[in-house]
Amino acid sequence: MTSPVLQTVALACERDLRLLFDNLELRLASGDMVQISGPNGSGKTSLLRLLAGLMQPTDGQVLLNGKPLGEQRSELARNLLWIGHAAGIKDLLTPEENLTWLCALHQPAERDAIWQALAAVGLRGFEDVPCHSLSAGQQRRVALARLYLDSPPLWILDEPFTALDKQGVAQLEEHLAGHCERGGLVVLTTHHTLSRMPAGYRDIDLGNWAV
């Protein structure tokens, strides 16, 4: 059996005095695409944030390469790319400036690489346009352009297809599947029905761990 990149051990999450899930056991390995599903309020986004080290569990733990997540923050920063439900960009900056700033936090990127990433998500010609002038879909593409840079192996994505048109959805599906087929790991939530899934695709319904 392939050693897991991410693993949860008896994981529990409580929000607003309500236990969302309990005793959650997951093993996520290289090559996997794992879709977290479940009804509204089941804790999908909370689970992603726990896996990304952005929240502390009520009980249990998350392991990265066999070691507790909290003990290896620098390792997590090198290995993780997190994109939340919001675009997470600064409106007053241009797409190029946003990506330069975001990449500088972890792995600085050259200008040519940033422009190529923006072109890959259909934003050629918008590199120097302030993001407040872009549509919601274009702003989402700025955030997703990080996936086309020299990115880490673990991607955790909350509703990545939000505000994308049909072409953008198809392109992103292909890119996510390709990342997994090259040995990466993708964990995501989405209300979109995926049409391009790698061999390592799994759907995990949090309703099975509801309390």
Swiss-Prot record:
Cross-referenced InterPro entries: AAA+_ATPase, ABC_transporter-like_ATP-bd, ABC_transporter-like_CS, ABC_transptr_haem_export_CcmA, P-loop_NTPase
Organism (species): Pseudomonas fluorescens (strain Pf0-1)
GO terms assigned for molecular function: ABC-type heme transporter activity; ATP binding; ATP hydrolysis activity
Keyword Transport: yes
Compartments where located: Cell inner membrane
GO terms of biological process kind: cytochrome complex assembly
Domain ABC transporter as annotated: residue spans: 6-211
Family: Belongs to the ABC transporter superfamily. CcmA exporter (TC 3.A.1.107) family.
Reaction catalysis annotation: heme b(in) + ATP + H2O = heme b(out) + ADP + phosphate + H(+)
Cysteines paired by S-S bonds: none
NCBIfam families, per database record: ccmA (TIGR01189), PRK13538.1 (NF010061)
Membrane topology listed for this record: Peripheral membrane protein
Purpose: Part of the ABC transporter complex CcmAB involved in the biogenesis of c-type cytochromes; once thought to export heme, this seems not to be the case, but its exact role is uncertain. Responsible for energy coupling to the transport system.
A GO cellular component entry from the record: plasma membrane
Enzyme Commission designation: 7.6.2.5
Subunit composition and interactions: The complex is composed of two ATP-binding proteins (CcmA) and two transmembrane proteins (CcmB).
The protein's name: Cytochrome c biogenesis ATP-binding export protein CcmA
SMART domains on file: AAA
Source organism superkingdom: Bacteria
Residues engaged in binding ATP: G38, P39, N40, G41, S42, G43, K44, T45
